[in-house]
Amino acid sequence: MNIILFGPPGAGKGTQAQHIVKNYKYFQISTGDLLRNEIKKKTTLGEDIEKIISKGEFVSDSVVNILLKNAIKNLKFKDKIIFDGYPRNLLQVENLKKNLIEFKQNIGAIIFLNVTSDIIEKRIMGRVTCERCNMTLNKYLNPKEIESHPCGRGFLKKRKDDGSEIAIYRYDTYMEKTKPVLDFYSNGPDFHEIDGSLEIQVIKGKIEQILKV
């Protein structure tokens, strides 16, 4: 089954997605990664995306849908996709539904990691990403993991959109824009809400129970 993994920026979606990928042989589709990859290509579209993200704003639905559809149509992902942080609004819900129907796929679980803004701010301020392996680490939540990172500390970089003010703005914007989506999915039997402030291993255990049902 495919999975939708929800939560505000800094909720730990990436960490949990990595766990599912490693242990359940899933493929993670993160709109953030798709956007950053487009930026790295230095295309005109990538330059426009970079300007928007640096302000803490969200990229348009039409652009996101183009990038996401290109990823979904890869047949090796069929019924093994984690949609990390997507969809964010009702239009994206409809776009996702159309894309899944077109490529004969569906959603089996919707998981929402619910976290407060003060915890989000601390998590985001301590977050770094490895430029070599793309792993996300946090110097506040798990400093030992940074010291022992196999790629070395020299590859750990802070993202441009991880400032304190931008972090809070992104949290508030996310919760405002995503609420209709959460309301839409929360009425279904496949919706699961998890306290995102719990220890990482506890959250992993709760997600594993969902996947085993």
Residue spans of the language-model regions?
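Glycine-rich phosphate-binding loop of ATP-dependent small-molecule kinases
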Residues: M1-V213
